[in-house]
Amino acid sequence: MVSGRVQALLEQLRAQGIRDELVLNALAAVPREKFIDEAFEHKAWENIALPIGQGQTISQPYMVARMTELLELTPQSRVLEIGTGSGYQTAILAHLVHHVCSVERIKGLQWQARRRLKQLDLHNVSTRHGDGWQGWQARAPFDAIIVTAAPPEIPTALMAQLDEGGILVLPVGDEQQFLKRVRRRGGEFIIDTVEAVRFVPLVKGELA
C-alpha cells in the first residue's frame, strides 16, 4: 500500500513529465527515508535534494526518475553507477535490473550505502571504492552508465566502457551544468542535451 506522501510525489513526478511506470514503481518501492539522516526524515518524500554529509547530496526524486528513465533499462541491462553516495539511486536501479555495479570515491559513504542496501535485502549490487572518472574497466562493457556528480567534461573512460547501443547519462559543466545523454552507435557517440541541472562536482583521482 503506497502512502499518501508517496502517492503525492508520484503524481508530482508524472506532472513533471516522468512517463515510465516501472521507474515510478521503483521509486515507490524504495523507502527514501532510509537513505538520509534522521533530522531530514520528515522531508524524505519531498521533491528536493538533501545533504548526506561529506559535501554530498541525495538527488531530488525528479532527477533520480528522469536520469533513470533516460537510461532505457531492461532487466538484463548491465549498469554502472558512478557516485554511490547514499545508495538511494543504486537501490532504484537494483529494483529495475538484475545487477548493478557502483563506484564511490568516499569510503565512508560506500560502507554506509552497502549497509543500507543489505538492510533492504538488495543483494544484486557490487560496490567499489575508486575514482569514478575511470569507471570500472574490469566489469565493462555496460549497457547503461549513470553519473550522479558533474564532471566539467564527459570522461573518455566512461564513453569507452559503453557497449554498442549503450547509454551514458550524466550532468556536465562547472558553473553552468546540463544533463547529457550519450548513446554509442558504431564508432560514433551521439550526444543530446536534456535540461539544465545542478549537481556537486565529480572529483577526479582523489579518494577519501
UniProtKB/Swiss-Prot annotation:
Q: Does the keyword Transferase apply?
A: yes
Underlying gene: pcm
The record, for Gene3D superfamilies, names: Vaccinia Virus protein VP39
Record keywords, A-Z:
Cytoplasm, Methyltransferase, S-adenosyl-L-methionine, Transferase
For this protein, what is the EC number? 2.1.1.77
Q: Organism source for this protein? A: Salmonella schwarzengrund (strain CVM19633)
Active-site positions on this chain: 59
- Report the function annotation for this chain: Catalyzes the methyl esterification of L-isoaspartyl residues in peptides and proteins that result from spontaneous decomposition of normal L-aspartyl and L-asparaginyl residues. It plays a role in the repair and/or degradation of damaged proteins.
Write down the PANTHER family for this protein, in alphabetical order. Answer: PROTEIN-L-ISOASPARTATE O-METHYLTRANSFERASE, PROTEIN-L-ISOASPARTATE(D-ASPARTATE) O-METHYLTRANSFERASE
Class of this enzyme: transferase
The UniProt similarity line reads: Belongs to the methyltransferase superfamily. L-isoaspartyl/D-aspartyl protein methyltransferase family.
The UniProt GO MF terms for this protein read: protein-L-isoaspartate (D-aspartate) O-methyltransferase activity
Provide one Gene Ontology biological process annotation: methylation
Cell compartments where the protein resides: Cytoplasm
* Protein name per UniProt: Protein-L-isoaspartate O-methyltransferase
